[in-house]
């Protein structure tokens, strides 16, 4: 198995339980490292099992209007250099963007360093949303960037059988993977 870095860029809208549910299946001796974008609630720090913390980077970034504006204008994460440094330090061979695909420019940079990139397709066709105009603008820009990254990324994974079939039609030359959706039913829900 390649030395793997799993990057989780958000814990919102069910993504936190999705990511922590997957990550918590790994063992500390697995050749896997983790980079979590944590917000003020520290979701990942609280929900990723303690024994994986030594292999984890928890990057706390406030969910502020300024950080959202930065992302909207520049189209990349402020912590990309931190991820690159981690890849170099840990000799990462494969990076899995578990919440999406990373930006096109960042993926190209990683691939130029010999690091394979695996993106996750959650919504091939994004849901319609009704929000305030400034939030709609941010949503549309984010969706366009994500769709561009999906088209450019050579390796894609999805948890949806129907999306997997659609991806096979759209991208017959890409490496496509299907993995069953992990259960979000926790012991608290039971």
Specify the residue positions occupied by each region the protein language model found:
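N-terminal strand-loop element at the rim of the active site
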Residues: 8-13, 24-74, 163
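A short, histidine- and acid-enriched strand-loop-helix "catalytic/donor-clamping" loop
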Residues: 101-104, 119-136, 154-155, 185
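Membrane-proximal helix-turn-helix segments that form the acceptor-binding/catalytic region
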Residues: 81-85, 105, 109-112, 125, ...
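Extreme N-terminal starter segment of soluble prokaryotic enzymes
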Residues: 1-5
């Amino acid at each position: 198995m390649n030395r793997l870095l799993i990057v989780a860029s958000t814990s919102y809208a069910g993504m936190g339980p999705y990511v922590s549910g997957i990550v918590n299946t790994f063992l500390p001796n697995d050749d896997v490292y983790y980079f979590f974008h944590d917000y003020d609630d520290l979701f990942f720090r609280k929900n990723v099992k303690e024994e994986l913390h030594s292999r984890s980077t928890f990057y706390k970034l406030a969910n502020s209007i300024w950080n959202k504006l930065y992302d909207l204008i520049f189209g990349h994460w402020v912590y990309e250099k931190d991820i690159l440094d981690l890849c170099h330090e840990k000799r990462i061979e494969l990076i899995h963007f578990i919440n999406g695909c990373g930006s096109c420019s960042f993926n190209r940079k990683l691939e130029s360093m010999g690091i394979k990139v695996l993106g996750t397709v959650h919504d091939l066709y994004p849901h319609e949303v009704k929000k305030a105009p400034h939030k709609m603008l941010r949503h549309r820009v984010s969706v366009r960037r994500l769709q561009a990254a999906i088209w450019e990324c050579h390796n894609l994974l999805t948890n949806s059988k129907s999306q997997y079939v659609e991806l096979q039609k759209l991208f017959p030359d890409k490496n496509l993977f299907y993995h069953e959706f992990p259960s979000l039913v926790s012991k608290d829900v039971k």
